[in-house]
Amino acid sequence: MGAANDAVDGRELMSAADVGRTISRIAHQIIEKTALDSPDSPRVVLLGIPTRGVILASRLAANIGEYSGIEVDHGALDITLYRDDLMSKPPRPLEETEIPAGGVDDALVILVDDVLYSGRSVRSALDALRDVGRPRSVQLAVLVDRGHRELPVRADYVGKNVPTARSESVHVQFSEHDGHDGVVISR
């Protein structure tokens, strides 16, 4: 995805304003689908997949709190040691897993990632989540779904569906990590 502040050449898919509107829309969808204000609603926990999934989870939690008045726990779930490509790709630094104080047992956990592609990161996240606790159910929220699934994975909340070629890359940029918001596609 590139290091912080790396310029990514390519075609802009989403501007900063588009990213903001899309995150707002996903937050509204989560509020509606989970019935957060219902007494029967399970506790909702957003767990971002590092790096940009953590930023997205934090922004979603802030938006949900602003729109519903309900504070949603959020954290980070490192999947590095659960990846199935550890031997074929350069080593990655371990990220910190941050589980909210209430844990994930019997909660509705929404895994959050920036881009859904093959589905392998989501599979790794499910494996990592199993070692953390036993949620009531698990859903998936992504900013961009670019297709080309290798595993039977489907997001419950999608900001934008973007058909891509396998030779293309989708780069999500957030100001907290990259200096600005946007989504770019490049070859």
Curated annotation (Swiss-Prot):
* Motif PRPP-binding, residue numbers: 109-121
> Annotated Gene Ontology MF terms?
uracil phosphoribosyltransferase activity
EC number(s) stated in the UniProt entry for this protein: 2.4.2.9
Transmembrane residue ranges: none
Which superkingdom heads the taxonomic lineage of this protein's source? Bacteria
Which reactions are catalysed by this chain?
A: UMP + diphosphate = 5-phospho-alpha-D-ribose 1-diphosphate + uracil
- GO biological process annotations for this chain's record? regulation of DNA-templated transcription
Q: Which Pfam families match?
A: Pribosyltran
Q: Which UniProt keywords apply?
A: Glycosyltransferase, Transcription, Transcription regulation, Transferase
Query: Which Gene3D superfamilies does the UniProt entry name for this protein?
Result: 3.40.50.2020
UniProt key word Transcription regulation: yes
Q: Which family does it belong to?
A: Belongs to the purine/pyrimidine phosphoribosyltransferase family. PyrR subfamily.
The free-text function statement in the UniProt record for this protein reads:
Regulates the transcription of the pyrimidine nucleotide (pyr) operon in response to exogenous pyrimidines.
Query: What is the name of this protein?
Result: Bifunctional protein PyrR
